[in-house]
Regions:
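Helix-to-loop junction immediately C-terminal to a conserved catalytic motif
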Residues: 537
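Juxtamembrane loop-to-helix connectors within ABC transporter transmembrane domains
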Residues: 192-193, 253-298, 355, 361, ...
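ABC ATPase nucleotide-binding domain helical subdomain, centered on the C-loop/LSGGQ "ABC signature"
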Residues: 459, 463, 548, 556, ...
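Transmembrane helices of ABC transporter permease
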Residues: 213-222, 226, 288-337, 409-422, ...
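Cytosolic ends of transmembrane helices, especially the final helix of ABC transmembrane type-1 domains
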Residues: 342, 346, 358-365, 389, ...
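Hydrophobic alpha-helical transmembrane segments of ABC transporter permease domains
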Residues: 184, 196, 205, 273-317, ...
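ABC-family ATPase nucleotide-binding domain "signature/switch" substructure
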Residues: 531-534, 564-572, 580-583, 599-603, ...
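Membrane-integrated ABC transporters
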Residues: 1-188, 201, 205-210, 229, ...
Length: 723
């Protein structure tokens, strides 16, 4: 496919590319390259393309897209063009858009200009729109010699197999129910034929009572089995929802911190619903449809026994309707994905606003925020409206098809009765069978509509389930030990960055920190201090070099030992609605009360807690809203101390405290004898550290004690003047 398209490519024209939606704002370039490769016949998962294009918290660069395209076997050329020059380039190509986005240029069709936007889907634009948004940077692609195509695996089939694994008994029971339900569907049309031909026309009134009794028994039989089948489906649905929900959340919370830093919390919470929707689709839509098709096959056999001609007419019209529905399905799939993305942005924006109400009110920005939120909501409404139009059109197809089938069958069947090829009872029975056959087939319209939504749900779930877990959860090669760490830390030639295709942010970083000593990272904003603290805690994995705890590489230490030995106090305070005890212990019931009290005393928060109603069982509001900023920060410090850590990492942990309280807490921490890594802008927090490392653009520019550094001209002298 790729080679044929390569030969037929010429300047201008139109190329319809497959739509790949970005899951986060920073991966538009990766999604665009997936679309271009998909057009040439090579389907690459978005999660793989993220890595290949070096997507970081700052997105991806055009140069990264070019290098990735070449690795996948494409010829890539970058140009600087105006709109007139763009119209002469072969399509598809990738455009830099609005100086902060990438889109796929599909070209011109008639009088319309098309782009495929990974954030919004396919868009029809005017030349003025393109001129105002196109920055002039364009990347052109063509299959190189040796380019190979690859088909995307059927994720829906794989998902069905994975989720129904171990449910053979339930599926078998449902199939048995389907077989039993075939009987009344086949018998009732026969009863209709007997009633018309033998009782009404034939005059055998003696048969009336027996036939009526048999029909009542059949209806009761059908109702009983339908009820039992519904119970089985409900049980299977609940079981699948619980199991898949557990697996989803289990995997979600084992993902690296970088995953969460690039996504809205509201969007992630919506994906829990997406995961549940997939399970509901399996049991309510897929299972029901498979049973309907199974039953329809038996109706079809009996229909051919009655009249092959009428059966052939009915099948032809049904297949025609299915063909039309299939051609509508792809558009519904893309629109469903767009709706879910817009809903995720809206919910994420709403949640962000609810967590920053103080800031909004203090700055008087309520109207601006509401306007921004209304923009998200309007996008949701527009997307839902477009999807609704398509879905309503698809709903109409089976209704029109069923009416057309009924009219034609009645017309042709009437001729057959007049010619003596059928009796009136046979035509009535056939019509009943045809209705029973077309009803489940007509329900395929709803199924096709729902399967497109399920594919969109699955894409958003797969974005999480295919993401590689945090390396800290890998158990291979870890030592078998249960004792806490002593607290010796050594970093040897550490390099790290947020994009594998860019220069490292941290490079050549080394230090040796003996047990019980302290070190501070200082520097201007963006110098890499917080990044370095996260590397020390194991949240970020270095590209090069080693982190040694007590002389053993960090990756060989059991995760449980690291969690109990290393505590971190972040500059972002995280408190949830619950008791103070739960906030301190994170629901760990094995932490003794004495350790909780001692930690709170060292954090200078114990007296405040005991004065609250219920003391340690006092319920905090969401985010600790019923505490002051300094109180929340002290509670965060106490949380880090309850496990009696050997290593304490503090990132701006005392920024909201007054100097007297700050000094008391630092003295209490030193008395504990734990190794300390401190990131701070305040001189009082770092002046007594055993070593101070001054950072600039990820590199060490000065190091030494406070007394040594304050005498040396350079960064540190300038920093302490502003502290």
């Amino acid at each position: 496919m790729g080679s044929r398209r390569a030969k037929g490519r010429r300047p201008g024209g139109y190329a319809k590319t497959p739509t790949v939606f970005q899951m986060e704002a920073t991966e538009c370039g990766a999604a665009c390259l997936c679309m271009v490769l998909g057009y040439f016949g090579k389907d690459i998962p978005l999660e793989q393309m993220r890595i290949e294009t070096g997507v970081s918290r700052d997105g991806s660069k055009a140069g990264n897209l070019m290098r990735a395209g070449k690795r996948f076997g494409l010829e890539v050329h970058g140009y600087k063009k105006g709109v007139e020059g763009l119209l002469k380039l072969p399509v598809p190509c990738i455009l830099h858009w609005n100086f902060n986005h990438f889109v796929v240029w599909e070209g011109v069709k008639g009088k319309d200009y098309y782009i495929n936007d990974p954030a919004m889907g396919r868009r029809k634009l005017t030349l003025e729109d393109i001129d105002s948004c196109f920055t002039g940077v364009v990347l052109c692609f063509a299959p190189a010699e040796g380019f190979t195509t690859s088909r995307k695996e059927n994720r829906l089939s794989a998902m069905v197999a994975a989720r129904l694994k171990g449910e053979k008994a339930s599926v078998f029971s449902l199939m048995i129910m389907g077989i039993f339900l075939i009987v009344p569907g086949l018998v009732i049309p026969v009863f209709s034929q007997v009633f018309i031909d033998d009782i009404l026309i034939g005059g055998n009134s003696d048969w009336m009572t027996g036939l009526l009794f048999a029909m009542i028994i059949t209806v009761i039989y059908k109702a009983g089995f339908m009820y039992y089948r519904g119970i089985l489906l409900l049980r299977l649905q609940n079981k699948l929802t619980l199991l898949s929900g557990y697996r989803f959340l289990f995997h979600l919370f084992r993902l690296p911190i970088s995953f969460f830093s690039q996504r809205y919390a509201g969007d992630l919470s919506q994906r829990v619903d997406n995961n549940n929707n997939v399970s509901i689709f399996l049991t309510s839509d897929l299972a029901q449809t498979l049973l309907n098709i199974f039953v329809a096959a038996f109706y079809l056999i009996l229909m051919f026994i009655y009249s092959p001609l009428l059966s052939a007419i009915g099948i032809f019209l049904v297949l025609l309707g299915l063909f039309v529905m299939k051609n509508t399905a792809k558009a519904i799939s893309d629109l469903s994905m767009k709706v879910q993305m817009d809903q995720g942005k809206y919910i994420g924006g709403m949640m962000a606003g609810l967590t920053m109400t103080d800031t909004l009110k203090a700055s008087g920005s309520e109207n601006e925020f509401i306007g921004r939120l209304q923009g998200y909501y309007a996008k949701c409404g527009i997307s839902e409206q477009k999807l609704g139009f398509r879905q309503e059109a698809m709903k109409a197809i089976p209704e029109v098809s069923a009416s057309l089938i009924g009219i034609i069958v009645l017309l042709v069947g009437g001729i057959q009765v007049i010619n003596g090829n059928m009796t009136a009872g046979m035509l009535t029975a056939f019509t009943a069978l045809l209705t029973s056959f077309t009803q489940p087939v007509s329900e395929l319209a709803g199924f096709i509509r729902n399967i497109q939504t399920a594919k969109a749900d699955l894409s958003r779930v797969d974005d999480i389930m295919r993401y590689r877990e945090d390396g800290r959860f890998e158990e291979n090669g870890r030592e078998d030990m249960t004792e806490k760490l002593i607290g010796d830390i050594r970093l040897e030639n550490i390099s790290f960055g947020y994009s594998i295709l860019s220069e490292p942010l941290i490079s050549g970083f080394s230090f040796d920190l003996p047990c019980g000593s302290s070190i501070a990272f200082v520097g201007a904003s963006g110098s890499g201090k917080s990044t370095m603290s996260r590397i020390c805690s194991g949240l970020f994995q270095p590209w090069e070099g080693e982190i040694l705890f007590d002389g053993v590489p960090l990756q060989r230490r059991p995760r449980e030992v690291l969690s109990s030995s290393v505590s971190t106090v972040s500059q972002n305070i995280s408190l949830f609605s619950g008791t103070i005890r739960d906030n301190l212990t994170m629901w760990n019931k094995y932490i003794p009360d004495n350790d909780i009290v001692e930690a709170c005393k060292d954090a200078c928060i114990h007296d405040l807690i005991t004065n609250k109603p219920g003391a340690y069982d006092y319920v905090l509001a969401e985010g600790g809203a019923n505490l002051s900023g300094g109180q929340r920060q002290r509670l965060e410090i106490a949380r880090a101390l309850v496990t009696n850590p050997s290593v304490l990492i503090m990132d701006e942990a005392t920024s909201a405290l007054d100097p007297i309280i700050e000094k008391k807490i630092i003295d209490n921490i030193k008395r504990r004898g734990c190794t300390c890594i401190i990131v701070a802008h305040r001189l009082s927090a770092i002046r007594d550290c055993d070593e101070i490392i001054v950072m600039d653009k990820g590199k060490i520019v000065q190091r030494g004690t406070h007394e040594e550094l304050k005498e040396q001209p350079g960064h540190y002298q300038r920093l302490i003047q502003t502290m």
